[in-house]
Curated annotation (Swiss-Prot):
Belongs to the NDK family. The gene is ndpk1. Keywords: ATP-binding, DNA-binding, Kinase, Nucleotide-binding, Nucleus, Transcription, Transcription regulation, Transferase. Changing residue 115 to A: Loss of kinase activity. No effect on binding to prefolded G-quadruplex (G4) DNA or to unfolded G4 DNA. Transmembrane segments: none annotated. This is Nucleoside diphosphate kinase 1. It holds the Pfam family NDK.
Length: 149
């Protein structure tokens, strides 16, 4: 099974969207493998977004991520990286389809509620950064009702 990293950003936490977001991933049939509520340090946020360090919006993004707690999660499932990105919606909420998290809950690209890994490689890197202890090793009893063998 594939894994992905999902982070509910400070605006999503402050607006009380944690349960709604978790519910959407669970209803799709994905498994929550790790979760923590974290106040992110500046140096950690800079490390997480290191690939964007040369972008003009980098410092604003870092300031946003450290402005309040985030919910960091690992989700597992078939094609969870690609499907997770579809559940989340486009980076710019105004380009996101209704029914996606950003399409339903965000209007500004600078307050777009959620982060999701954009590739398997990014997911592996982000999971290792945020969860060095690794995710929980368990399987839902619903597994055979969601996935064929």
């Amino acid at each position: 099974m594939e894994s992905t990293f999902i982070m509910i950003k400070p605006d999503g936490v402050q607006r009380g969207l944690i349960g709604e977001i978790i519910s959407r991933f669970e209803k799709k049939g994905f498994y929550l493998k790790a979760l923590k509520l974290v106040n992110v340090e500046r140096s950690f946020a800079e490390k997480h977004y290191a690939d964007l360090a040369s972008k003009p919006f980098f410092q604003g993004l870092v300031d946003y991520i450290i402005s309040g707690p985030v919910v960091a999660m690992v989700w597992e499932g078939k094609s969870v990286v690609t499907t997770g990105r579809k559940i989340i919606g486009a980076t710019n909420p105004l380009a996101s389809e209704p029914g996606t998290i950003r399409g339903d809950f965000a209007v500004d690209i600078g307050r777009n509620v959620i982060h999701g890994s954009d590739s398997i490689e990014s997911a592996n890197k982000e999971i290792a950064l945020w969860f060095p202890e690794g995710p929980a090793d368990w399987q839902s009893s619903q597994h055979p009702w969601i996935y064929e063998k």
